Amino acid sequence: MGKQNSKLKPEVLEDLRHQTQFSEEELQEWYKGSLKDCPSGHLSVEEFKKIYGNFFPYGDASRFAEHVFRTFDTNGDGSIDFREFICALSVTSRGQLEQKLRWAFSMYDLDGNGYISRQEMLEIVTAIYKMVGTVMKMPEDESTPERRTDKIFRQMDKNMDGRLSIDEFIEGAKSDPSIVRLLQCDPQAATQS
């Protein structure tokens, strides 16, 4: 993402090859597309929310998009550059399950203290419910954000301290694939659980 060149510099390309799961060709294609969509080289939270919202026309994706943006913006400068975007995309689209879960944990851990509180989980789950609108039919025990949060905590909070450690989060998700679908808000969650 930048005005100067339509191709990544060889040293940047090499670095991104090692940091991501993308081939050189894929990285160049993503870079070319990002120049077209974002000539400034940086995506603001408002621009990101607008783009993200296009994928969820029947709901309000703005709150969830803000959480995704915060997690993509690894240097915390309030914008996403190509490196941040492509590294996050690599984890979320091609990473191993544990990498994806660690990434998701960092999004849910709003205050960055290494734990997900019930309130943090509720904030994210509420944002997901607003994003999907009425498109997804939820089972009765997940019919509200509060109920879904309670269900996740019942299944994951093994030491019952009211917060999820990264180990509880990862183990809980790995031991019950329906939780992964719940966390990712997979529309098939209701039919496969």
Curated annotation (Swiss-Prot):
SUPFAM superfamilies: EF-hand. The keyword Zinc-finger does not apply. Ca(2+) 2 binds at residues 109, 111, 113, 115, 120. It holds the Pfam family EF-hand_7. A lipid is attached at residue 2 (N-myristoyl glycine). InterPro entries: EF-hand-dom_pair, EF_Hand_1_Ca_BS, EF_hand_dom, Recoverin. It comes from the Eukaryota. Residues 40-58, 60-95, 96-131, 144-179 form the EF-hand domain. The keyword Metal-binding applies. Ca(2+) 1 binds at residues 73, 75, 77, 79, 84. Probably binds two or three calcium ions. This is Neurocalcin. It comes from Aplysia californica.
